[in-house]
Structures are given as structure tokens and as C-alpha cells.
Amino acid sequence: MRKTVIVAMSGGVDSSVVAYLLKKQGKYDVIGLFMKNWEEQDENGECTATKDFLDVEQIAEQLSIPYYTVSFAKEYKERVFSRFLKEYTNGYTPNPDVLCNREIKFDLLQKKVRELKGDFLATGHYCRGGLDGTGLFRGVDPNKDQSYFLCGTPKEALSNVLFPLGGMYKTEVRQLAIEAGLATATKKDSTGICFIGKRPFKSFLEQFVPNSPGDIVDFDTQKVVGCHEGAHYYTIGQRRGLNVGGMEKPCYVLGKDMQKNVVYIVRGEDHPLLYRKELIAKELNWFVPLQGSITCSAKVRYRSPDEKCSVYPLEDGTVQVVFDIPVKAVTPGQTVAFYQGDVCLGGGVIAVPMIHQL
């Protein structure tokens, strides 16, 4: 009996190629499923979800596969967006894409897959699953690898997931779409956080979090050098948008004191206080059980390089991560992913103090 695979289709070229490849294999009954997570219009007054769904319809018709749509807009606001706002208000810099994968795509969407009697869920993520269906590996394209965004998803939620693009380069995917004549072959990739789109981040956030003006302080001199409209708008390592003039060197955000509503800056991109030798990570998820301390590498941001480190489990369920070489702009609230070679061991949320303890 043929197995049924549900393809999470976004209206983009990646998920279109996933559906095409699985249909071409001929061993699956392929069903497309479009997931809508956000109701509002973009900065031009257009509903991007509607445009994306029309592309899904077109691809499904090209491939002669059935397709459905499901809205998780209410659940997304409750389980992802509300936490995103809370974290920012408290001075952290969360990664909503990691949270969306855990709470929506590989939880609620998996339930919909079961409702549709699907045996597998397939997505357009550039990563690879383990042979037993419960591991996670980097995608072969180092520029597109998305295992970082899945490091917080429980391994059980990935046990039936197919990643057809994990062994491909983006250029190959795009070329295949062109050769197959897929309607989305030349469609631009989506960028940024889905609910923000192309809008400036600050103008979006101030719709939900009121401005709270305060001082910008030079940490070395403890002198006020500027003012800000809200400490929550700034993240560690940030350079742009500080509006601090008269400095010999570029200024960077060192940290924030949310109780005092102060943003601390330092001068120079190589200022030693911008670098941290260690961090504490919480809310951990492991694909490979942590049996005592380990040596591995870690990514503290999606586009950051791998940093060699040692990981030590602590009694409260968190871990201490000690880097071989100090790492720049370690940011509370961001995701840290752990690797040994191509194997993603797991990940967690960075929970270091806001201000360096000197």
C-alpha cells in the first residue's frame, strides 16, 4: 500500500520543488498543505498569505495533487508572537523562527497531518534527518543549512519528517524548478520574520510596545552620550541606529539594564567587553542525550560561525558553555545550537546576564 506524504507548502520555490520531487518518485500519494500563521496585511496593504496561497494552488494544479489550507493564526499569536513580545519587553532578543518550528510546524501541523491520514510530513528545510528518523544533520549547502532553526524541536516531532532538499544546494533547487517549469521557479525567497515582512523592525515593534525614552551610557566612562526611545529596541552587538555622535570609534551595544532603562555602549568593534568566554543555556532540547560534559561546537546566531566549546550540565537543568576562544555579541534570548561535525546535538536559549559582571 502506498504511503501518503503531506508537503508543507508555503508558495515558495523550495516547498514547490519538494512536492515535485516526491510526486516524481512515484511511490507516494502526495498532498499539499498550506499553513497560514498571520492575518494582517503587509506594508503595502496586501495580504501576502493570499498571494502565497495562490502560488500553492498553481503548483498543486501543475503537479495534479490535492491541497488543503489550515489557519493557525490564533495559535501562532498565543504560542509564538505573545512570547516574542514578552521577551523583547524584558530585554531579550528571541528567535521566533525556532519557536514557530517547535510550537506550530512540528506540533500543530503534525496533528493536521494525522487528521489527513498522512504517513509523513515533508518540508523545504535545508537539513537532513537521521536514518532512524529521530536525528538531525546539517544540510549539505553550508550557506542554506537550516538545522539551527530546528535545534529546539523535540526529536519525536521529527520522526516522520522528510527533508528532500537536505542533500541539495539552493542553486540546484532553483535550476530544477526552472527545468520543471514550476510556476514559482523565479519567485524571490522570503526574508526576515514572517509577521514583520519588509517593514523596519522598530516601526513594527512600536505598534505593540510603547516607547520608553532613556539614556545611552558609555560603559567605560559611565557618561551619558545619547538617548534612546526604548531599551527593548536594541540588541547586544548592534551598531546601527544608536544616534551617538562625536566618537572616535564606532559604538556598539554592550548590554541593557531594563530596570534603569539604560542602554550601555562601548567604543570599537574589538572592545574586549563585547566578547564572552562562556554562557548559560536553558530550555534545552537534545537529539543526542547529554551524558556528562562534552566537547563540540556551537552557533550563537544563525549566521555565526561554529565556535569550539565544552558543555557542562548543571544541576538545575541548564548547561554551562565554555568557548575555546571568546565569542562576540553573545545575546540573551537567542538560540544556541550544538554540533559535532554535521550532527546537530540539540540546542537551547541563551540565558547569560544582561550586563557584564566586572
UniProtKB/Swiss-Prot annotation:
Site feature Interaction with tRNA, where: H125, Q334
Catalytic activities: S-sulfanyl-L-cysteinyl-[protein] + uridine(34) in tRNA + AH2 + ATP = 2-thiouridine(34) in tRNA + L-cysteinyl-[protein] + A + AMP + diphosphate + H(+)
GO molecular function: ATP binding; tRNA binding; tRNA-uridine 2-sulfurtransferase activity
Any GO CC annotation of this UniProt entry: cytoplasm
Signal peptide interval: none
S-S bonds: C100-C194
Pfam families: tRNA_Me_trans, tRNA_Me_trans_C, tRNA_Me_trans_M
Described purpose of this protein according to its UniProt entry: Catalyzes the 2-thiolation of uridine at the wobble position (U34) of tRNA, leading to the formation of s(2)U34.
HAMAP family referenced in this protein's UniProt entry, alphabetically: tRNA_thiouridyl_MnmA
PANTHER family named in the record: MITOCHONDRIAL TRNA-SPECIFIC 2-THIOURIDYLASE 1 (PTHR11933:SF5), TRNA 5-METHYLAMINOMETHYL-2-THIOURIDYLATE -METHYLTRANSFERASE (PTHR11933)
Family: Belongs to the MnmA/TRMU family.
Protein name: tRNA-specific 2-thiouridylase MnmA
Protein's organism: Chlamydia muridarum (strain MoPn / Nigg)
Top-level taxonomy: Bacteria, Pseudomonadati, Chlamydiota, Chlamydiia, Chlamydiales
